[in-house]
């Protein structure tokens, strides 16, 4: 624990670190590999500069641990993982391994944190349009909480559950921020569309939703399809078999 305060041994508690490492290394059942760190508190930052500040503070918290490691277990590693900091920070002194879990896809949350451009988001959910209501600039999609989760982002006083894009031949076109998923029920979502886009969708069309939190989408939806139509299988849990 280098600052997140979710769980784990505090990085500065070298007494407990030493006891655990010695116990693990002397067991016939285990091998001491090193230290696993997730700085999830960077997700609470309000700006890119604050993300870097939190990251640098975590590195400082790890400095004594690194010195201890070099003296007692020099072959062990320090493994660090959090996508916001690993996307924009430059200093990774004394870190042996980086594991940014959301680096491959990104999402709209990462964009608003300052980790990436919206064009870097590499995942979208294709949702069928089930109803259109141009009189109130809204469409209803088959894409609700069970498909998109209920994670949300608030920007400029507006809370949304996904950004909107139009499907093209091999990718998608992201619409302006005033077009967004404004409300979710279990199976359906309500999407606000500006006047210039509301009449471009009919029931049965597909609309692309850039998720707020892409880590949750594959477990909710199953297989993925790339922009060339290839199916990408994901790891599944099998119970009672």
Task: Please describe what each predicted stretch is.
Residues 59, 126, 185-188:
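Short amphipathic alpha-helical surface patches that serve as generic macromolecular interface elements
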Residues 2-117:
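Active-site loop/helix belt of alpha/beta enzymes
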Residues 134-241:
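C-terminal accessory subdomain/extension
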Residues 58, 118-120, 179-182:
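Short Gly/Pro-enriched turn/cap motifs at secondary-structure boundaries
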Residues 24, 78, 98-100, 129, ...:
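Generic structural hydrophobic/aromatic packing signal, biased to beta-strands
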Residues 14, 18, 123, 174-175:
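Structural motif corresponding to alpha-helix initiation and N-cap regions
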Residues 84-166:
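Active-site loop ensemble at the mouth of alpha/beta enzyme cores that anchors a bound cofactor
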